[in-house]
Amino acid sequence: LATIIETRDLSKSFKNVDAVSGLSFSILKGDVYGFLGQNGAGKSTTMRMLLGLIYPNSGQIFINGTEFNNSRRYLLQHIGAIIERPDMYGYLSGWKNLEIFAALSRQQIPAARLHAVLEQVGLKGREKDKVKTYSQGMKQRLGIAIALVHEPDLLILDEPTNGLDPQGIADMRELIVSLSREHGKTVLVSSHLLHEIEQVATRMLVIHKGKKIVEGAVKDLLHPDETLVEVVIMKDATIAGKLAGTQWQQHLQASTDTGLTFKLNSKYIPELSKWLVMNGAGIMEIRTKHSLEDYFLSLTNDEVTKHRTV
């Protein structure tokens, strides 16, 4: 599949504080690409760099194979985005808002296209109502319609379910999936809520303190035959090094002086335990974790040092 966006060693700091550090990832055509991280992890900063709203201190961004800095205005024609809550004219109708923002795109956009995007986002029949009468979920959907009017290749959504009620959240999930499956859009969607990403994304990136922790297909990260095995050991700074070159190294997800986290089939736990004991590890406890939430928490532990791409 074609690569829509690629970043290489992207870094950004504010007043000597690293917001994003050496971030490299790629988004493929047709992906619903989940961008997952705790609040303050660097998600919004990265998205702003992708849109040219702020500039990286170092690193490169490529859109459809072309470096962003070389053709910024042209490349932005291929991207639609909502960063935080979209600003709209509440005293005007949804249709009038759509017309105004379509005009700002500097493209000739026919009325038929405006009708089409309203249909896509589920606002057909409400376009004549004033925006101030819309629910928050409807405003978000109108924002997406505005982002879609110029038929972009990529749609960037920053925390699109924030502030929505349960029905609004469900509607937004359904819309994101529909835009990908039925309308062929590539979507980059960020969230600090793991279960939101799990339900819509095909591929995902976990970011923590501005650094990539793991990237891969959601189905691979959620492999049903594998589980997380957390081994609590007596303090030993050498055990992780002993894993190098062994069959267990490829399964290691995270390591500290007092704990190791592996991702593997549970049937191998006895064999792993035997190897650890034979190599001097004082095992205090072995715990298994099955949920993606536990996986996320283990990956974003402050002491995680191992970065991995699936």
What are the roles of these predicted feature ranges?
Residues 67, 192, 216, 235, ...:
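Short beta->alpha linker loops
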Residues 227-299:
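Short, charged/small-residue-rich alpha-helical element at the C-terminal edge
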Residues 1, 225:
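Exposed loop/turn and edge beta-strand positions of beta-sandwich/beta-sheet ligand-binding modules
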Residues 2-7, 12-189, 194-208, 214:
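ABC transporter nucleotide-binding domains
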Residues 219-223:
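Short acidic-hydrophobic catalytic motif
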Residues 106, 184, 248-249, 301:
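Residue-level recognition of short, structured coil/turn motifs
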Residues 303-310:
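Short, charged, intrinsically disordered terminal tails
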